[in-house]
């Protein structure tokens, strides 16, 4: 159970749930599962797939290449090192763009993936391999 989902954690439930968009991520081993339950949020309104309203994100990329580079850096330089320290779950913000946010991995109309799919696959495989080493 995740009692606080990123808010003021009072030590209840099975999960220590962290939301982190702007600060260095520092995970320490805990008695509960540590989950990064909100992170990412890199905005890029893909041309031709924008939502009907003006939208925002937690940082804006100017192109697919920049979005992919920033996403890769976040995964490999911020998330990956924390796996050895006990990070056990990830929830990226967010799966797809919505009416007022363009920080999804998929477009608002869900017809296109925004970062480069080959890069996403390679990084996800690296994260999975690193995680598997922590549970062996």
What annotation goes with each model-predicted range?
Residues 1-111:
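Substrate-binding/catalytic cleft of secreted carbohydrate-active enzymes
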Residues 107-136:
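Catalytic cores of secreted or luminal carbohydrate-active enzymes
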